[in-house]
Structures are given as C-alpha cells and as structure tokens.
C-alpha cells in the first residue's frame, strides 16, 4: 500500500468519524430505573438532556433511594448511547476494510 493511498484512507476515516459524531449528538437514548419511575434521556455523546422522577417517589422522601435510581437511569441511558456509538464506529472500520479497528 503506498503512502498516498494510506493518507486518503485516513482522511476518509476522519471525515466519516466526524459525520458519525455529529449524527450521534443529534440522537437521544432513554434509560430507566425503579420500574420506569425514574427516566433519563441522554444524547449520543452521553450528555444528560432530560430527567423525569415520578412524583410518588418524591413523596416517599427517601433521598438516598431516589439518588440511586437517578444514577442507574442515567447510566442505563449512557450505556445505550455508548453501544450505539460503538456499533456505528465498528461499521465504519468494516466499510474501510479495517477489521477490528474499533
């Protein structure tokens, strides 16, 4: 493989990676905990966009439980975003003929 071909392939990879990042940022992923009483929505980069806590949980006044449920819901949403991102980057590596790149 000559250097020019390698450089073109690297440039193409960089452009495609940027497109994937932009697409992922525009997507949203939801995680939940407590049987759906706590829901978190993150974008494809894992940033928290929205949080919903069922008012009945707030009435219980069990702050530690609520905090734990929030953490679990956010982590679940972030994990979904991470899996989607990894899937897209794996496809990118496969499309460029670079198996196992991501």
From Swiss-Prot:
Q: GO terms for CC?
A: bacterial nucleoid; cytosol
**Which Gene Ontology MF annotations are present?**
DNA binding
Q: Name one Pfam family in it.
A: YbaB_DNA_bd
Gene3D superfamilies for this protein = Nucleoid-associated protein YbaB-like domain
Keywords, in A-Z order? Cytoplasm, DNA-binding
List the subcellular locations.
Answer: Cytoplasm, Nucleoid
What is the role of this chain? Answer: Binds to DNA and alters its conformation. May be involved in regulation of gene expression, nucleoid organization and DNA protection.
Regarding protein family, the annotation reads: Belongs to the YbaB/EbfC family.
Show the HAMAP family listed in the entry.
DNA_YbaB_EbfC (MF_00274)
Subunit structure, briefly? Homodimer.
Q: What is this protein called?
A: Nucleoid-associated protein Minf_1672
Q: What is the species listed in this Swiss-Prot or TrEMBL entry?
A: Methylacidiphilum infernorum (isolate V4) (Methylokorus infernorum (strain V4))
């Amino acid at each position: 493989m000559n250097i020019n071909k390698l450089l073109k392939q690297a440039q193409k990879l960089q452009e495609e990676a940027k497109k994937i990042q932009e697409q992922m940022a525009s997507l949203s992923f939801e995680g939940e905990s407590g049987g759906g009483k706590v829901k978190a929505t993150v974008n494809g980069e894992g940033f928290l966009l929205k949080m919903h806590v069922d008012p009945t949980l707030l009435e219980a006044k069990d702050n530690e439980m609520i905090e734990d449920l929030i953490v679990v819901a956010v982590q679940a949403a972030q994990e979904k975003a991470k899996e989607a991102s990894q899937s897209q980057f794996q496809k990118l590596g496969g499309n460029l003929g670079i198996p196992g790149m991501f």
